[in-house]
């Protein structure tokens, strides 16, 4: 099931990059959690499925453009680790990027949690893995 989970995450990130929240969340469980508790920004917290669309709309709406590039997928049983770079362009034309890693947790073929980590190493260590 791991490769299927990777494809679900890849499809969700592609949909996120298009701004299609419904498609992004189409393979999530009703109890899905978007865990930004390790964020260093003002969006720190854990968001339930009902809150995620508004969170993304507010966050993406602060920029002229937002795009996430995937660097790597790591299959880990019911989890998928994704290292990525988020590219943003502000209203004044200033561009920035930030690296992060995500752990997507799956149960019965749907995502139940997406947890953000500052680095791929942090994400792997949270799962008891090493590079």
Task: Enumerate the language-model features and the residues they cover.
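A solvent-exposed, acidic/Ser-Thr-rich amphipathic alpha-helical stretch
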Residues: 22-78
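A short hydrophobic beta-strand element
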Residues: 77-86
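Short, low-complexity N-terminal intrinsically disordered segments enriched in polar/charged residues
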Residues: 1-30, 110, 126-131
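Short beta-strand edge/turn micro-motifs at domain boundaries
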Residues: 102-125
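A short, polar/proline- and glycine-enriched secondary-structure boundary/capping micro-motif
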Residues: 92-95, 122-128
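Short, surface-exposed coil-to-beta transition loops
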Residues: 66-68, 95-102
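Hydrophobic beta-strand positions in extracellular immunoglobulin-like domains
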Residues: 86-88, 106
